Curated annotation (Swiss-Prot):
PANTHER family: ALDO/KETO REDUCTASE (PTHR11732). The active site is at Y58. It comes from Fragaria ananassa (Strawberry). Belongs to the aldo/keto reductase family. Substrate binds at H121. NADP(+) binds at residues 216-275. This is D-galacturonate reductase. GO terms for molecular function: D-galacturonate reductase activity.
Length: 319
């Protein structure tokens, strides 16, 4: 079983919290059937994954909860405390009075008493009637960061979440949040990979003590919205051949060497294990230099999901 390092999160109030640097993502489109998802999560636990990333919007919280219960029954883990669980507040419920009911619904789905990291999923508020995307402009509203964050802090104070964070937040949004936060965000989860390196935003987060977690670290390859700009890179392929590793392993190692944790998703048993096997080598200065010059392009924009509305384009411009 692979041994995965952990990172200490510095923005968790008075608590010291550690998080495994590689987490298994559980989003899939179209959504995987529950039995397939549960089997994959159990296999991931056997392989050594201890961090699992889900969200209310993914529809995978119940699958993860049932898999955790089964892992306990099978004694793959001795206690729920061995796992680090991240889930997210969906944008349709991103208002002060809905945060507490939302985390309680997630806790029920997951069959756990606390969440390790509760994250604001999107930097917008969506109307509750949203069922399909793109959406009309009036259904995309500015996020009331102050009131929502106060409710997130309450989740932590009540012990329902051990850490709280954000996702897809720009530096200006983080500046606003930090100006009033009693408990600063522990993480900012962002799309990041060798083909979208986000150095300026990462440097900002580091200076503020906010840890960055990368989603789509392989460019969302093999999905309808991703492409092969990472796994198909000639430069990454050249480095992979020289090291006897896969292009995915080189890409994940690069993300890790930036001081960033990773959420990667595969339900393939072999790839699942390969994605953990990145801690027995390092990239050379020459290799890092080559990768720093890869062509840069963001994989998914909010405008491509929600529509080219002014509020959406403004966030895309900063990310």
């Amino acid at each position: 079983m692979a041994k995965v390092p952990s990172v200490t999160l510095s923005s968790c109030g008075d608590d010291i919290q550690t998080m495994p640097v590689i987490g298994m993502g559980t989003s899939s489109y179209p959504r995987a059937d529950p039995e397939t998802a549960k089997a994959a999560i159990l296999e991931a636990i056997r392989a050594g994954y201890r961090h699992f990333d889900t969200a209310a919007a993914y529809g995978s919280e119940k699958d993860l909860g049932e898999a955790i219960a089964e892992a306990l029954r099978l004694q793959l883990i001795k206690s729920r405390d061995e796992l680090f669980i991240t889930t997210k507040l969906w944008a349709s419920f991103a208002e002060k009075d809905l945060v507490l009911p939302s985390i309680k619904a997630s806790l029920s789905n997951l069959q756990v008493e606390y969440i390790d990291m509760y994250i604001i999923h999107w930097p917008f508020k969506l109307g509750k009637e949203v069922r399909t995307m793109p959406v009309e402009r009036d259904l995309v509203q500015p996020l009331d960061i102050k009131s929502v964050w106060e409710a997130m802090e309450e989740c932590k104070k009540l012990g329902l979440a051990r850490g709280i964070g954000v996702s897809n937040f720009t530096s200006s949004m983080l500046e606003e949040l930090l100006s009033f936060a009693e408990i600063p965000p522990a993480v900012n989860q962002l799309e990041m990979n060798p083909a979208w390196q986000l150095k300026k935003l990462r440097d900002f987060c580091k200076a503020k003590g906010i840890h960055v977690t990368a989603y789509s670290p392989l460019g969302a390859a093999r999905t309808k919205w991703g492409d092969d700009r990472v796994l198909g890179s000639d430069i990454i392929e050249e480095i992979a051949q020289a090291k006897g590793k896969s292009t995915a392993q080189i890409s994940l190692r690069w993300v890790y060497e930036q001081g960033v944790s990773i959420v990667t998703k595969s339900y393939n048993k072999e790839r699942m294990r390969q994605n953990l096997d990145i801690f027995d080598f390092c990239l050379t200065e020459e290799e890092l230099e080559k990768m720093s010059h890869l062509p840069q392009r963001k994989g998914v924009t909010f405008a491509s999901i929600l529509g080219p509305h002014d509020i959406v384009l403004e966030v895309d411009e900063e990310l």
